[in-house]
């Protein structure tokens, strides 16, 4: 299953962004070469103060997230495929065969209509043996009301993101300005046991060295750490995929109790995958988020330096060079008896990239009457 490790744009501190512009066609190609043939998104970060002096700004924010949009599931019929013609099966609709000795009412049930498809018995207030019928202390089973459960909503947490940043901006009044900023972010996402911590350090300096030469430099260091990045997509390793296949009569909290309170050992023999009810490939969703972990440690340094040279009246030369170095250490792990991995799974991956871009631009501007000529 794919893992969302983020992208380069997310490494920027929003407090450092001055402007965002879109260049199309020849304008983009002229400035950024063939890679910008289809256009370019240009993000300009902030520089130092425009007026002499020292400025300090501090920002702190907290953001809360909740899963707010849900599929439109039908809630008239319970789990089942509707194919049984056996009246005893329909009457004793259940997920577990119950011998008379373990039934609180003394009536055995052998009818088991296994299916995650939601076209079983209609929700009419009847009582059946079900997945949650077992009393774990007495090992007895009782019939429970056949009711629809919002089985997917109870899984998600309220996500919280804390952002704190401080920036210092300076201008000496003699042609030199600088800016330095620090940002710290801490996130707990809506999927349990997922989130990240990140820090961003940014510095920029601009100096008019003399009347014909100006120098600009910017550098950013970004660090991100996560003990677990969630999987996504249509795969049995994705919690969101797993939830789709849960029967609509089983509350997701049942899977949490199995995992957190040690009931897995009593429900499954050693060596048997911890699967959802009536599944051959979907793991217990809480085992997925607490033990099938995808860690990330990322360090990234990127920046640029530019010289603007006034060669003559209307004639300027821009020399630019930029560097982007990224190093990531990733791990993926699955415990014993994960579906498809009876002996577990562990993987380490180091992803390193270095990109250096340099260019120059010679431009000439001249005003002729009511017209401007640029080349």
Where are these regions (language model features)?
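Surface-exposed loop/interface segments of Gram-negative outer-membrane beta-barrel transport/assembly proteins
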Residues: 1, 50-147, 175, 189-196, ...
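Transmembrane beta-strand segments that form the barrel wall of outer-membrane beta-barrel proteins
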Residues: 182-188
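N-terminal periplasmic accessory domains that precede
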Residues: 8, 30, 36-60, 164-166
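Residues on the lipid-exposed face of transmembrane beta-strands in outer-membrane beta-barrel proteins
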Residues: 45, 160, 166-170, 203-207, ...
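Short Gly/Pro-enriched turn/cap motifs at secondary-structure boundaries
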Residues: 155-159
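Short acidic/polar hinge/loop motifs at secondary-structure boundaries
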Residues: 2-25
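Outer-membrane beta-barrel channels and translocator barrels
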Residues: 14, 161, 173-174, 208-210, ...
């Amino acid at each position: 299953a794919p893992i969302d490790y983020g992208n380069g744009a997310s490494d920027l501190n929003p407090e450092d962004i001055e402007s965002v512009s879109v260049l199309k066609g020849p304008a983009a190609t002229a400035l950024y070469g063939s890679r910008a043939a289809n256009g370019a998104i240009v993000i300009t970060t902030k520089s130092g103060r425009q007026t002499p002096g020292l400025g300090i700004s501090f920002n702190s924010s907290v953001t809360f997230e909740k899963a707010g949009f849900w599929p439109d599931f039908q809630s008239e019929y319970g789990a089942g495929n509707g194919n049984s013609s056996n009246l005893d099966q329909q009457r004793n609709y259940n997920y577990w065969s119950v011998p008379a000795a373990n039934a609180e009412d003394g009536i055995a049930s052998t009818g088991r209509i296994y299916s995650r498809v939601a076209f079983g018995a209609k929700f009419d207030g009847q009582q059946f043996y079900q997945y949650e019928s077992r009393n774990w202390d007495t090992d007895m089973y009782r019939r429970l009301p056949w009711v629809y459960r919002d089985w997917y909503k109870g899984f998600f947490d309220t996500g919280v993101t804390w952002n704190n940043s401080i920036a210092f901006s300076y201008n000496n009044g003699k042609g030199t300005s600088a800016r330095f900023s620090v940002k710290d972010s801490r996130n707990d996402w809506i999927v349990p046991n997922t989130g990240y911590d990140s820090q961003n350090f940014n510095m920029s300096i601009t100096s008019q060295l003399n009347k014909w030469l100006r120098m600009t430099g910017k550098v950013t260091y970004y660090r991100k750490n996560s003990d677990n990045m969630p999987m996504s997509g249509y795969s049995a390793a994705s919690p969101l995929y797993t939830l789709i296949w849960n029967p609509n009569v089983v509350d997701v909290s049942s899977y949490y109790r199995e995992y957190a309170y040690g009931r897995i050992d009593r429900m499954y023999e050693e060596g048997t995958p911890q699967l959802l009810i009536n599944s051959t490939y979907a793991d217990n969703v809480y085992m997925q988020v607490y033990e099938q972990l995808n860690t990330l440690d990322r360090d990234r340094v990127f920046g640029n330096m530019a010289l603007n040279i006034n060669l003559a009246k209307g004639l300027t030369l821009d020399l630019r060079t930029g560097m982007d170095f990224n190093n990531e250490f990733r791990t993926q792990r699955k415990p014993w008896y994960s579906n498809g991995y009876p002996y577990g799974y562990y993987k380490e991956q180091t992803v390193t990239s270095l990109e250096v871009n340099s260019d120059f631009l010679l431009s000439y501007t001249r005003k002729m009457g009511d017209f401007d000529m640029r080349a």
